[in-house]
Amino acid sequence: MTEVKLDHPGGQLSMPVNTAIEGPAGIGVSQLLKQTGMTTYDPGFVNTAACSSGITYIDGDAGILRYRGYPIEQLAEKSSFLEVSYLLTYGELPTQPQLTEFTERIRRHSLLHEEMRRFFDGFPRDAHPMAVLSSAVSAISTFYQDSLDPFDDEHVEMSTVRLMAKVPTIASYAYKKSIGQPLLYPENSLGYVENFLRMTFGVPAEPYEVDPVMARVLDMLFILHADHEQNCSTSTVRLVGSSNANLFASVSAGVNALFGPLHGGANQAVLEMLETIRADGGDVRSFVRRVKDRQAGAKLMGFGHRVYKNYDPRATIVKKAAQDVLGRMSNSDPMLDLAMELEEIALADDFFVSRRLYPNVDFYTGLIYKAMGFPTKMFTVLFALGRLPGWIAQWREMIKDPETKIGRPRQVYTGAAQRDYVNLEQR
């Protein structure tokens, strides 16, 4: 086994290197504290691998994203969201009978318990759909208390199917609640994405015809968001799951992590930026100059990524989808033109190129969601719907991993040294 040696004040420590199929290897530091009395210090876990995983591979420098070895470009073009969900969950692409069975199982469990309607009634009308989604995901576990054991394979299978089936229903209910419209039951003759669109935008008074182009584009966007290695929300799902919390509780925690604007709110921020540019007369070059001069309020949103130091491979796919979707609209959205002009100017400017600031997946997704009719507060919910199979797959992998331990990071203490208590009257 390859080792690296660390010289420290007390001597030298040999540490094993965990090799990777692709990408960086990991230095095993499990004996570091015991042998040296010191810990690693890595705010944000930028250089820390908390697990080994066989699900998603990213090469940020080369702009590569693969699910279970399959390039994201191929999956987005040729696959479907439920097929990709199967791939992430079980490790291989399904045969036709396997995919049919998987789809049918999900379809049969799309209905929510009737008592959940009273649960939704407890939220104020202006409740953010992400808060409702997180609460409801946790709450539905109370209806299945006999099948929550994370170490029972049958329980895990049922929890997997129930989450995949019911989260779109919850998401549509959260939206309907916010606009004061009645909740629609699922229509199981429809496909997964078509059913979600109907529950979200349909009304009982008239039939709702799902636009097949919009359904396919949303299905593709779900694929692009399905997993992304050990990001904030996925790491949260794993961390909570490491305590042996059930799948519902762990995914609910992941939803809350995604709710944070630094993680799930970027596409909304892009729209707000484009609105600002348009309100100021549509002068993109002037806006870019203000960004470079670091003027107050001028921030380039939708560019750059924590991992990708090249063009986000998902962004290329989303850009084409945005052009297709918005090109079908009777009135073209001027913000698409602004976005494309901004991208062109930024990619030709050494200021941004030298800083490796390239468009990410969020740069165009907000425009597509807006064109479909979703309000901005639903954007992060759509992100969560896409990320759901990734959270499930990562949780299942973590539960089966013999190296899994309850997550318990260390700290470098910087508080007060020991001091004696002073009675209140003497202070």
Say what each PLM segment does.
Residues M1-R427:
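Non-transmembrane, aqueous-exposed alpha-helical and coiled segments at domain scale
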